[in-house]
Amino acid sequence: VVVPISGSDMSSLLYKRWVRKSAEKVEELSGGRLGYVHIKGMNDESFRTVYSDILGRYNDCEGIVIDTRFNGGGRLHEDIEVLFSGKKYLTQEIRGKDACDMPSRRYNKPSIMIMGEANYSNAHGTPWVYKHKNMGLLVGKPVPGTMTSVSWETLQDPTLYFGIPVVGYRTSEGTYLENSQLYPDIDVENTKENVVKGRDEQLEAAVKALLEQINSS
């Protein structure tokens, strides 16, 4: 029996396949040395998934590729900053064997972040913080300056609601992130010729750059 599914269910399945294939490609290209996570949205659910993966299945990897492409925003820049800015200060040892590094609830190894033209709102702010705090390199294409926060308003018809930008984010130099385009450290375009072949040039570039960083350290 063939049971039809909704368009949203189809999109969810395609997304999961894309993430799985991206993770498999990173494992293949790095020889198992790197892990891969995609931040689907700047929200609690996505954060829990990323947290679980980097400190769980990828705990023994030498570094992590953080993918923020196609992320529509939310509010997670502070959490991502804290999570990926860990600096090792102790190693727990049990009976002569290393158990874990500390801090044990933050990521202490090298990382790299991929971004793209479809990043929006906090998916602009998060890569900005990542670069501003010198946490790692940015790979991909420039992200439009869309980092604002909105106030959600509902009209008399509750099915009609919209967000009004009311919060700007100003740097110490007095520049607002809104309308300030963010440029990657490594500019790589996913050409349509390679996209239709299933090739992700931005992902490949991120793996190459992170491995070079690890090998030179």
Residue ranges and their predicted role:
Residues 1-157, 194-202, 208-215:
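Cleft-lining beta-strand/loop regions that shape enzyme active-site pockets
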Residues 119-121, 156-187:
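Metal-dependent DNA phosphodiester-chemistry modules and their immediately adjacent helices/loops
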